[in-house]
Amino acid sequence: MKNKNKRLLVMAGGTGGHVFPGLAVAKQLQSEGWEIRWLGTADRMEADLVPKHGIEIDFIKVKGLRGQGLKKLIAAPFQILGAISQAKKHIKAWQPDVVLGMGGYVSGPGGIAAWLSGIPVVLHEQNAVAGLTNQWLSKIAKRVFQAFPGAFPNAEVVGNPVREDVCQLPHPKERFAQRTGPIRLLVMGGSQGARILNTTLPEALPQLSHEIEIWHQAGKGSQETVEQAYRDNGIADAKVTEFIDNVAEAYAWADLLVCRSGALTVSEVSAAGVGSIFIPFMHKDRQQALNADHLVQCGAAQMIEQQDLTVQGLVDTLNGLERKQLLDMACNARDAAIIDADVRVANAIKSLAK
């Protein structure tokens, strides 16, 4: 007898940019009585993260093809066929009503397996440039969503699903109302940190013409090095952490953010309402630069391409930002936010469930 509750299988893995938006959609549907299961790989972050959110996960064996040697490329078709077969077994055993692909290597075999099994596939592309897996799957998906314009020519722009505590932060006008004293600068390079931020910021910040308070996420294994870099440049009170567990608290604290422009970061700072200086990672397809572009265009952020980043240039940029301008940037960021992406994607999934 078929289970009375609707079931969603989420395919996402590899990075937080794929996994966290998938979790946001999953939680939305769980609140409406849906059962959720996950398809991932055993050696990536989803293996630990997803079960912590109370969601069972199945694994398939699959790796990316970029940068592989000739022998591995020759073997790749057999690996992909094996991964599709594994995914089909998991799908047959659990019988989801809909499959949601959020990106990562696992989505390719999982999406094909769902299509072969007659299960409708919904895709969400987090970046302004579509990943290779989603480019392929878009041809067989029932619905395709994109966070930013341009990833697909005809897909609906819904933003990225962002964690609820970020979306619920008070408006920038309320947060900034009583702030005086040093400008609060939050530096984030992602969970792995960003070497160029870890080296440039400690050198640039002592040269500013105004006081500043610093919270710097250095990334795994870099905390002591970055702390020492600040001390070497005369700043003894910088708060340096490997990770920021409560990112909503950090956004609420900050007057300005200096960071990479990964898709989820761009969506989060917009939802939070924080002005930003983006230093995009140098992808050959300029993915991160294109992610940030819409916030730059609406006056919510400035962007310095990594190849153009210098200590003096960063000093000049930061010196040019006063509290009034920071508030304007924060308000523009909030105005540009799409904070119901999880609901929009969830509604599409519900419409496809038989």
From Swiss-Prot:
Pathway: Cell wall biogenesis; peptidoglycan biosynthesis. Its main location: membrane. It is an enzyme of class 2 (transferase). InterPro entries: GlcNAc_MurG, Glyco_trans_28_C, GlycoTrans_28_N. Cell wall formation. Catalyzes the transfer of a GlcNAc subunit on undecaprenyl-pyrophosphoryl-MurNAc-pentapeptide (lipid intermediate I) to form undecaprenyl-pyrophosphoryl-MurNAc-(pentapeptide)GlcNAc (lipid intermediate II). Belongs to the glycosyltransferase 28 family. MurG subfamily. This is UDP-N-acetylglucosamine--N-acetylmuramyl-(pentapeptide) pyrophosphoryl-undecaprenol N-acetylglucosamine transferase. It comes from Aliivibrio fischeri (strain MJ11) (Vibrio fischeri).
